[in-house]
Amino acid sequence: MAVQQNKKSRSARDMRRSHDALSENALSVEKTTGEVHLRHHVSPEGVYRGRKVIDKGADE
């Protein structure tokens, strides 16, 4: 079992944890439909960068 040889200071512990923060997802609004979607992803209506790339009717 691993056991530390010397105690880590509060500063060293906090510096290690400085990159652990979570951030919110970057959301975009589609210009043509107004749909909210993740950046660089197709919107729920099948539109990407103003163009219809997925026909929702064909999938069903």
From Swiss-Prot:
Q: Where is the composition biased (Basic and acidic residues)?
A: 11-22
The protein's superkingdom reads Bacteria
Region feature Disordered, mapped onto this chain: 1-44
| Classification via Pfam families | Ribosomal_L32p (PF01783)
Q: Which GO terms describe its molecular function?
A: structural constituent of ribosome
InterPro entries in the record:
Ribosomal_bL32 (IPR002677), Ribosomal_bL32_bact (IPR044957), Ribosomal_zn-bd (IPR011332)
User: A cellular component term (GO) from this record?
Assistant: large ribosomal subunit
Query: What keywords is this UniProt entry annotated with?
Result: Ribonucleoprotein, Ribosomal protein
Q: Which family does it belong to?
A: Belongs to the bacterial ribosomal protein bL32 family.
**Per its UniProt record, what PANTHER family does this chain match?**
50S RIBOSOMAL PROTEIN L32, LARGE RIBOSOMAL SUBUNIT PROTEIN BL32
Protein name, per record:
Large ribosomal subunit protein bL32
Species of origin: Pseudomonas putida (strain W619)
The record lists the lineage as: Bacteria, Pseudomonadati, Pseudomonadota, Gammaproteobacteria, Pseudomonadales
